[in-house]
Amino acid sequence: MRQNRRFLRCQVTEQIIPRVGIASDAHQIEAGKPCWIACLLFDGVDGCEGHSDGDVVAHAIVDALLSASGLGDLGSFVGVGRPEYDGVSGTQLLIEVRELLITRGFTIGNVAAQLVGQTPKFGPRREEAQQVISDILGAPCFLSATTTDHMGFTGRGEGRAALATAVVWTG
């Protein structure tokens, strides 16, 4: 108790506030469409449908960054009715959200995302994907992948999903 009182009497002269965002994305698999996951093309694997390239990992990260910064979500950022975003890449979305955050006074601390799906085999390219996204955002990126043991739409191979968190700083 005494330690808490001492802390409360301290004056903070410069305040840096971390903000955390969480998000998810999911898309149905579309036969014959290129498979973009975490800004990498996976040859020989069907991609995901969508207004954009269907990169669930990149989309979840964009959404988590927007959530952490209080700037909305992917739908309000690009929307589905804007033709200039037809087929837009996850890479381009990450670049644009990074620039938006910088102009609003945010610094990206780090991002983490998990791919959920039966395909593609992500492990062999995980480090490559982490480096690509880290380079785009100018911040550490940590990625993982899992399956759902053949349960649900991802387990049946009907689609893919991703979960992401992001830490941004203000101040």
Swiss-Prot record:
Positions bearing the site annotation: Transition state stabilizer: 51, 147
GO biological process: isopentenyl diphosphate biosynthetic process, methylerythritol 4-phosphate pathway; terpenoid biosynthetic process
Top-level EC class as recorded in UniProt: lyase
MF-aspect GO terms: 2-C-methyl-D-erythritol 2,4-cyclodiphosphate synthase activity; metal ion binding
EC number, as in UniProt: 4.6.1.12
Reaction(s) the record says it catalyses: 4-CDP-2-C-methyl-D-erythritol 2-phosphate = 2-C-methyl-D-erythritol 2,4-cyclic diphosphate + CMP
Pathway: Isoprenoid biosynthesis; isopentenyl diphosphate biosynthesis via DXP pathway; isopentenyl diphosphate from 1-deoxy-D-xylulose 5-phosphate: step 4/6
Paired cysteines (S-S): none
InterPro entries associated with the record: MECDP_synthase, MECDP_synthase_CS, MECDP_synthase_sf
Database matches in Pfam families: YgbB
Binding-site residues, 4-CDP-2-C-methyl-D-erythritol 2-phosphate: 25-27, 51-52, 73-75, 146-149, 153, 156
Cofactor(s) annotated in UniProt: a divalent metal cation
NCBIfam families for the chain: ispF
Family in the record: Belongs to the IspF family.
Protein name per its UniProtKB record: 2-C-methyl-D-erythritol 2,4-cyclodiphosphate synthase
Natural source organism: Corynebacterium efficiens (strain DSM 44549 / YS-314 / AJ 12310 / JCM 11189 / NBRC 100395)
Lineage: Bacteria, Bacillati, Actinomycetota, Actinomycetes, Mycobacteriales
Gene (UniProt): ispF
